[in-house]
């Protein structure tokens, strides 16, 4: 029978899949190679034509002037900075010199004073009088000129000072004195015949708190003291480590600090929980020993009585059963033990198959027909029942399935055969009955389930039917809840004879049988695992090689983990070690495979240099603000963590809706209102709806109740900040990618420099990179990356208006009118702002306002939130449309125009203004729907012609 959990695949299918994958890879590589070669060829052609270097001489001169101005400004700024620095240093130097001079003068005056005092001669009165005059003169002059402040003459050494420690010690001494005084008063009030022992000898009158502390200690151990919880936590941490491909120590360190800390807690909990139970278990073991001899004798008597009853039945007179009885008498326990160890490997089943009676084949066919409805695949229910049996440990039932391999009919019907203890191993047989259902239920599960029922000899493919019938019978027996019973088989004819004497429960484990049982269990479990993990019966060395090379899937890893848990529950150390070795080998193979993939990816991809970027969010009005750093540690993800409910009502009144209502003030609410958008509200709505959708039980009767209940659940710590950071990262990456490929940024490599006509300080004038709508079609573009006119600074807007006036004058000289268009759609894409100028004849220019107003009124949604047409005759677009809204604007020459706030961007085309102009000028639709590219020569002619028109009206030269 095929091994459970192993998928087979032919070599041809593997080879074909590899071949198709190889062909697909080659196809992708060839396509990328062709694309790369095409781009390189196009670049070479552009370079050969001079497309990447050619530009107007005036533009080149202007760029040189800008570069010189920049260098001059830089040099000037450096010079000013240097001058300021030198000036500051000079001031410092002068101050220092002045200070040194003052110090030197003071020192010299003191020195001179000292020298003058030493030079006095106490010889005559005349000298004394002369000596007194110079002393009085400088003192009086210094007193008059340099009168010192009071704090300068204050004697700080004479001031009394106290430290903090002294003050603290003084306060403690005062408190101690008060305490002693109160105690003396209490002692004075006591009588010499006081009976309270806790108050008599200076006590407080109350007993010590030892009893309360011991009570607390005793109450600390509830049930198992948290041992099961810690073990369950350890199992979940192992599952999380397997799921996230991390080491177990790191997962344990996240929750408990370190593995040593967790083991310490577990040991303390086990000592607290099981320390007092060990003595009880020893006493219970001594009581169980007294019952063993009675159970053994009682079981032997029951078996002999059952055998005597069996001899009276007529089924033993059948030839088929005589052969089975002969095998039981002749071979005995020694032959069965030898078969259990190695008989099935040498093929002894073939020798015994010759001893079958002539009726065996007929009985086998009949049993297969009767059991055809019960041919089921052995499921994991057998393993579960076996696990319970090992845990409870019945010696008689656990060894019941170590049987001699007889013919397939006997194996499919022999449910009553049991192997006894190590001292008594006589086999018990059941009478085969015609009713297969009674035969299936005759073998009942006891308090310990029949663990070794599936530990059978591997059979060939022609015996699959018998194997499946045996699996069905054992599944039926393992699902039973009755105690294990040796019952007498019944006949269909014997209605009055019920089940024979049922035997007692076998829940207690006999100490004399435990070593033998454990040995049988470990060997049988190992045989079962080998039969499940191998596809054919092969040697153990080939199995180990296959396991080392095998890379298990997640589902197979989960099943293997379940087997490990079952082995831990059963206490089967040998099987547990083997399964753990398999798990470690599978993990190592998986990690090795992941490392190989990472190395291949690193080798294929070029090294990316890391750079620090300031993360910021942009509000709908275009203002940007940096993202705050995490204020608290983010809780780990993974696992099943139930969200905690917050307290929303107090005394029947609602006090909060969300978990962070207490930490939000008015300023924070205003900030959120200004900085959040409708998309943020929609995202919050969808998150709350997704978690509560489908759960309308309990308090959630309506949709509103669902949202209220979801809002009252506490979110994971730091989750909102993590969400803001992820959004900021996405916006930064999107903006960086857009600016890198922007064809209008002045410092971008995608900018067609040969189409530039004039360059100002903040704005430049260029021609479109495709076929123009009309001759003279041009673009006014900001130098820096700005997305809309509503977010421009005053100096940029002023320079755009300067270019606009110059273009109007230029086209007026040619008796032409002009229309200025701007379309700002999808603010998230951060498209560069383009202000287009399209010339047209004057008679059409006079009719243009009518065309545009009618088209705007009929465009977009029928029911709009904003005004359909916004008049720009008395104000510009920056004052008429709020920042952050998508809009379309049109201006007619130097007059005002119209603006329209776009309600539905899917219905509003990006070529709306060009389409109206194309209809007025009767142009073909491909001019504005999908613009036609021009070659370099046509573009150069167009640029030279427009430069001649622009030269007399160049506002950049007059401005410079």
Swiss-Prot record:
Coiled-coil intervals: 13-101, 163-279, 540-605
One Gene Ontology CC term in the entry: post-mRNA release spliceosomal complex
UniProt cross-references to SUPFAM superfamilies, sorted A to Z: HIT-like (SSF54197)
Comp. bias intervals (Acidic residues): 108-117, 541-552
Biased composition (Low complexity): 135-146
Keyword Coiled coil in record: yes
Biased composition regions of type Polar residues, renumbered to the chain: 507-518
Segments of skewed composition (Basic and acidic residues): 16-52, 165-181, 261-372, 404-417, 713-731
Domain of life of the source: Eukaryota
Compositional bias of kind Basic residues: 73-96
Keywords of the record: Coiled coil
One Pfam match: CwfJ_C_1
PANTHER family named in the record: CWF19, CELL CYCLE CONTROL PROTEIN, CWF19-LIKE PROTEIN 2
Family in the record: Belongs to the CWF19 family.
Protein name per Swiss-Prot or TrEMBL: CWF19-like protein 2
Naturally occurring in which organism (per UniProt): Danio rerio (Zebrafish)
Taxonomy of the source species: Eukaryota, Metazoa, Chordata, Craniata, Vertebrata
Gene this chain is encoded by: cwf19l2
């Amino acid at each position: 029978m095929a091994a459970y959990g192993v998928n087979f695949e032919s070599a041809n299918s593997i080879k074909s899949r590899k071949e198709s994958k190889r062909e697909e890879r080659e196809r992708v590589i060839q396509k990328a190679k062709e694309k790369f070669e095409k781009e390189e060829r196009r670049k070479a052609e552009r370079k050969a034509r001079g497309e990447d270097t050619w530009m107007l001489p005036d533009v080149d001169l202007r760029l040189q002037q800008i570069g010189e101005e920049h260098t001059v400004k830089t040099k000037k700024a450096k010079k000013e900075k240097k001058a300021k620095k030198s000036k500051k240093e000079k001031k410092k130097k002068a101050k220092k010199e002045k200070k040194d001079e003052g110090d030197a003068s003071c020192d010299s005056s003191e020195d001179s004073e000292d020298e003058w005092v030493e030079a006095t001669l106490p010889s005559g009165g005349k000298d004394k009088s002369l000596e007194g005059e110079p002393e009085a003169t400088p003192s009086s002059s210094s007193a008059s000129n340099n009168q010192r402040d009071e704090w300068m003459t204050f004697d700080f050494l004479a001031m009394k000072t106290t430290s903090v420690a002294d003050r603290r010690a003084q306060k403690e001494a005062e408190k101690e004195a008060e305490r002693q005084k109160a105690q003396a008063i209490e002692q004075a009030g006591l009588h010499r015949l006081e009976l309270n022992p806790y108050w008599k000898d200076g006590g407080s009158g109350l007993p010590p708190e030892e009893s309360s502390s011991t009570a607390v200690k005793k109450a600390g151990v509830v049930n198992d003291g948290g041992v099961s919880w810690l073990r369950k936590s350890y199992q979940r941490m192992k599952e999380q480590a397997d799921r996230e491909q991390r080491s177990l120590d790191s997962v344990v360190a996240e929750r408990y600090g370190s593995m040593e800390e967790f083991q310490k807690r577990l040991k303390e909990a086990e000592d607290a929980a099981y320390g007092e139970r060990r003595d009880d278990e020893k006493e219970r073991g001594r009581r169980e020993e007294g019952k063993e001899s009675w159970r053994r004798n009682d079981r032997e008597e029951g078996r002999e009585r059952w055998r005597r009853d069996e001899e009276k039945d007529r089924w033993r007179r059948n030839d088929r059963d005589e052969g089975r009885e002969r095998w039981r008498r002749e071979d005995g326990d020694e032959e069965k033990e030898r078969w259990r160890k190695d008989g099935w490997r040498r093929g002894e089943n073939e020798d015994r198959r010759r001893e079958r009676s002539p009726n065996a084949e007929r009985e086998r066919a009949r049993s297969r027909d009767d059991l055809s409805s019960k041919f089921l695949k052995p499921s994991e229910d057998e393993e579960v029942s076996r696990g319970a049996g090992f845990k409870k440990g019945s010696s008689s039932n656990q060894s019941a399935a170590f049987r001699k391999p007889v013919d397939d009919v006997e194996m499919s019907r022999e449910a009553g055969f049991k192997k006894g203890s190590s001292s008594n191993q006589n086999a018990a047989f059941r009478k085969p009955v015609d009713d297969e259902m009674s035969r299936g239920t005759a073998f009942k599960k006891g308090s310990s389930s029949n663990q070794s029922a599936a530990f059978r000899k591997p059979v060939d493919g022609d015996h699959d039917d018998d194997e499946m019938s045996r699996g069905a019978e054992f599944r039926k027996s393992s699902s039973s809840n009755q105690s294990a019973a040796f019952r007498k088989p019944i006949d269909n004819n014997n209605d009055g004879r019920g089940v024979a004497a049922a035997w007692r429960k076998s829940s207690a484990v006999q100490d004399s049988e435990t070593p033998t049982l454990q040995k049988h269990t470990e060997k049988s479990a190992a045989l079962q695992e080998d039969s499940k993990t191998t596809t054919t019966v092969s040697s153990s060395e080939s199995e180990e090689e296959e396991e080392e090379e095998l890379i298990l899937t997640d589902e197979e890893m989960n099943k293997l983990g379940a087997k490990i848990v079952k082995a831990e529950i059963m206490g089967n150390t040998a099987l547990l070690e083997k399964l753990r070795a398999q798990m470690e080998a599978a993990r190592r193979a998986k990690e090795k495979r992941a490392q190989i993939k990472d190395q291949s990816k690193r080798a294929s991809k070029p090294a990316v240099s890391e750079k620090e970027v300031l993360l910021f969010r942009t509000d709908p009005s275009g203002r940007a603000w940096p993202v705050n750093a995490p204020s608290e540690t983010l809780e780990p993800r993974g696992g099943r963590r139930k969200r905690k409910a917050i307290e929303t009502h107090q005394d029947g009144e609602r006090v909060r809706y969300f978990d962070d209502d207490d930490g939000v003030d008015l300023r924070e609410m205003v900030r959120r209102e200004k900085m959040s958008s409708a998309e943020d509200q929609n995202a919050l709505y969808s998150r709350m709806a997704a978690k509560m959708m489908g759960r309308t039980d309990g308090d959630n009767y309506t949709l509103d109740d669902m949202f209220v209940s979801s809002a009252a659940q506490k979110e994971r710590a730091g989750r909102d900040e993590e969400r803001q950071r992820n959004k900021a990262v996405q916006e930064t990456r999107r903006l960086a990618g857009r600016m890198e490929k922007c064809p209008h940024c002045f410092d971008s490599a995608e900018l067609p420099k040969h189409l530039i006509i004039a360059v100002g300080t903040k704005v430049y004038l260029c021609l479109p990179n495709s076929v123009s709508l009309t001759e003279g079609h041009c673009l006014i573009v900001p130098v820096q990356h700005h997305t809309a006119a509503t977010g421009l600074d005053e100096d940029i807007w002023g320079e755009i208006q300067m270019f606009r006036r110059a273009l109007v004058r230029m086209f007026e000289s040619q008796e032409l009118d002009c229309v200025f268009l701007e379309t700002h759609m999808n603010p998230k894409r951060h498209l560069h702002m383009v202000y287009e100028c399209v010339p047209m004849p004057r008679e059409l220019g006079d009719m243009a306002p009518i065309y545009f107003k009618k088209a705007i009124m009929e465009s977009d949604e029928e029911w709009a939130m904003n005004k359909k047409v916004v008049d720009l005759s008395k104000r510009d677009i920056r004052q008429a449309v709020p920042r952050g809204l998508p809009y379309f604007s049109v201006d007619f020459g130097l007059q005002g125009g119209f603006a329209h706030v776009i309600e539905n961007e899917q219905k509003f085309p990006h070529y709306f203004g060009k389409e109206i102009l194309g209809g007025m000028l009767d142009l073909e639709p491909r001019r504005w729907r999908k613009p036609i590219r021009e070659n370099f020569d046509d573009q150069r002619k167009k640029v030279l012609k427009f430069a001649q028109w622009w030269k007399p009206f160049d506002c950049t030269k007059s401005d410079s």
